[in-house]
UniProtKB/Swiss-Prot annotation:
Keyword Metal-binding: yes
Self-association and partners: Homotetramer.
Binding site for Mg(2+): D76, E145
Reaction catalyzed: UTP + L-glutamine + ATP + H2O = CTP + L-glutamate + ADP + phosphate + 2 H(+); L-glutamine + H2O = L-glutamate + NH4(+); UTP + NH4(+) + ATP = CTP + ADP + phosphate + 2 H(+)
Regulation: Allosterically activated by GTP, when glutamine is the substrate; GTP has no effect on the reaction when ammonia is the substrate. The allosteric effector GTP functions by stabilizing the protein conformation that binds the tetrahedral intermediate(s) formed during glutamine hydrolysis. Inhibited by the product CTP, via allosteric rather than competitive inhibition.
Binding site for CTP: S18, D152, I153, E154, K192, T193, K194, P195, T196, Q197, K228
Designated name of the protein: CTP synthase
Keywords: ATP-binding, Glutamine amidotransferase, Ligase, Magnesium, Metal-binding, Nucleotide-binding, Pyrimidine biosynthesis
Domain Glutamine amidotransferase type-1: 296-545
Length: 558
């Protein structure tokens, strides 16, 4: 029997500045390697001291991406899942907080046998265990993105661990990819390489020499500049990759492929590979850049000043557009602007559909309710997600049933009509008697759909699984009243105790649907989520005159 090939490790580092697109570069390379027939998994090492981003301010961190096993992770894990078209788990995101918590717990249990616990070897060994834990019999390549920028104090233990991994598994089994910035200086009309040179020098100071450099720039990089980077940073000229700003993130795999990055990596690591078949990806890009139709979808949210707070929602909308051969123009609507009927009418004027995403806290809630009342009364296709479902129920209770003051106990503990209430197992958290972090209803849970409902039609089955992140639920004491007034409870947990989906009948509204889950987390560009596909289809039909929907099915993964 042939010996199993050693799992290869590819580390992605960043230099000069943050937000260069390390995650997208790593995701796109993973996409290319998978298209070449390799089995790829990915991991993000985050240098912050938080255990996870679950309690971090969305304005600072962006969205929290929840995996099937309930881990609250960095938004880059969402990029990994979408580009690899695979489900990852909590081991895909490692933070300094997790590492130190684990090491300190082991020290308290006496596992270090009286050793003086230090960054080297104890912290670095813990990091290495997490990295090597991603390898396995069914994995050819582990791509590990090291967060932060080379030179940051917080990143040093992760870089040292990566250096040691190379020493332990062999240099032929490890590849270091450095993503750096080539800034353009207007007065001189030049792309400058010096920041990248200093960045690579800083990397060398910790014992790492990059095998390839991805040069980010806002304009094409001339051959003489690439040659200079090659010479001064001591990498092969073919390993200097030009990554100019792309119109769409889904262009990046083709950009990197055209530069030869994937071919260089597989040759350098001695991996077997096949050629990439671009047929289906090209059709996806055609729908991205030259769609047959366009729709405008309003996103009514609390954190619209930072679009990354809703990254997966936006990508799910775009994927729903791809499925319908439609471009999606997102109108960012701060929920506060919709508190009055006039404000909602102005903010939502001429939109073809609305999505009300998740969130926490009372700020902006009355605006979400105002937006939902406007879309319900005016027949505008609407999709509610998590908090969006709760707001749909509150708005319906107030304005259809007539329960004045109906609310969620999250926003008004003294409400006379608590149509949304704290889940039983969350009472101690809300009361402050348990930790807040990592204690919500997290991860993938099943739901049973009601036959002949819109969600049943969209999913095409009666049992589904979706990812969740919430503490509050529809109060069962009001379910009978809600249903009697016309709100359809179209999906529940298998035991019937938790409301998972609500909708209005199509005889009343063309598309008014909400879920307690976060379906955006399971959407892929090549496998759009049915709820978002349905929203975009309804938005196209809502336009006047209706646009013919003669599109082919969305392309599947290569």
């Amino acid at each position: 029997m042939a010996a199993r090939q050693q799992t290869k490790h590819l580390f992605v580092t960043g230099g000069v500045a943050s937000s260069l697109g390390k995650g997208l570069t790593a995701s796109s390379l993973g996409n290319l390697l998978k298209a070449r027939g390799l089995r790829v998994t990915m991991q993000k090492l985050d240098p912050y001291l938080n255990v996870d981003p679950g309690t971090m301010n969305p304005f600072q961190h962006g969205e929290v991406f929840v995996t099937d096993d309930g881990a609250e992770t960095d938004l880059d894990i969402g990029h990994y899942e979408r580009f690899l078209d695979t489900d990852l788990n909590g081991s895909a995101n490692v933070t300094t907080g997790q590492i130190y918590s684990s090491v300190i717990a082991k020290e308290r249990r006496g596992e270090y046998l009286g050793d003086t616990v230090q960054v080297i070897p104890h912290i670095t060994n813990e990091i290495k265990d997490r990295i090597r834990g991603m390898a396995g019999r069914d994995v050819d390549v582990v791509i590990t993105e090291i967060g932060g920028t080379v030179g940051d104090i917080e990143s040093l233990p992760f870089l040292e661990a990566a250096r040691q991994i190379r020493h332990e598994v062999g240099r032929d089994n490890v590849f270091f990819l450095h993503v750096s910035l080539l800034p353009y200086i207007g007065p001189s009309g030049e792309l400058k390489t010096k920041p990248t040179q200093h960045s690579v020098a800083a990397l060398r100071q910790v014992g790492i020499t990059p095998d390839a450099i991805v040069c980010r720039a806002d304009r094409p990089i001339p051959p003489n500049v690439k040659k200079k980077v090659s010479l001064m940073c001591d990498v092969d000229e073919e390993a200097v990759i030009s990554a100019v700003d792309a119109p769409s993130i889904y262009d990046i795999p083709k950009v990197l492929h055209a530069e030869g990055l994937d071919a260089y990596v597989v040759r350098r690591l001695g991996l077997p590979f096949r050629d990439v078949d671009w047929t289906q990806w090209d059709e996806l890009l055609r729908r991205v850049h030259d769609p047959a139709n366009r729709v405008t979808i309003a996103l009514v949210g609390k954190y619209v000043d930072l679009p990354d707070a809703y990254l997966s929602v936006i990508e799910a909308l775009r994927a729903g557009g791809i499925a319908n051969d439609a471009g999606v123009d997102v109108r960012w609507v701060a929920s506060d602007t919709c508190e009055t009927p006039g404000g909602a009418a102005k903010a939502l004027q001429n939109v073809d559909g609305v999505v009300v995403p998740g969130g926490f806290g009372v700020r902006g809630i009355e605006g979400k309710l105002g937006a939902l009342r406007y879309t319900r009364e005016n027949g505008i296709p609407t999709l509610g997600l998590c908090l969006g479902l709760q707001c749909m129920v509150v708005e319906f209770a107030r304005n259809v049933i007539g329960l004045a003051g109906a609310n969620s106990t999250e926003f008004d503990p003294a409400t006379p009509y608590p149509v949304i209430a704290t889940m039983a197992d969350q009472m101690e958290v809300v009361a402050g008697r348990r930790d807040m972090g990592g204690t919500m209803r997290l991860g993938s849970y099943p739901a049973i759909l009601a036959p002949e409902t819109l969600v049943h039609e969209l999913y095409g089955c009666l049992e589904v699984r979706e990812r969740h992140r919430h503490r509050y639920e529809v109060n069962n004491a009001y379910r009978q009243q809600l249903e009697a007034a016309g709100l359809v409870i179209s999906g529940t947990s298998p035991d019937g105790q938790l409301v998972e989906f609500v909708e209005l009948p199509r005889s009343v509204h063309p598309f008014y649907v909400a879920t307690q889950a976060h379906p955006e987390l399971r959407s892929r560009p090549t496998r759009p989520h049915p709820l978002f596909t349905g929203l975009i289809r309804a938005a196209l039909l809502h336009r006047c005159p209706p646009i013919p929907l003669d599109t082919e099915p969305v392309p599947t993964a290569r």
